[in-house]
Amino acid sequence: YHFIRATLESIAYSTCDLASQMEKDLGQEIVSLKVDGGASRSDFLMQIQSDYLNKDLYKPTCIETTAMGAAYLAGLAVGYWKDQNEIKENWQIEKVYKNSISEEIREQRLKGWHKAVKYSMGWAKD
């Protein structure tokens, strides 16, 4: 159990680091995230991502967006949908994950993550 939890937490921490760097590179804040794919099946992962990012996460009713995208493109090609706006109307939210921790706890956990990453750098030697 602890190994699985640590793996999911590392995904959330890594996502937080990536989003932070993206905000710096873009020069603007990412307000919220839309999540999909197999990992979004984990309520635990989605909640801690929301907590660590301090952002709302929106999970659609259909998380298999690659397959849906292919179906939408095929539908557009044969005229089933008239345009992309009609497709966008099909997107429905199943669940919204909202931050549930204080800024103090978030900072403490992120500091611990960065400390662990720093220490692990010495483990790999040429």
Residue ranges of model-derived segments:
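Glycine/Thr-rich phosphate-binding loops that ligate phosphate moieties of nucleotide
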Residues: 1-126
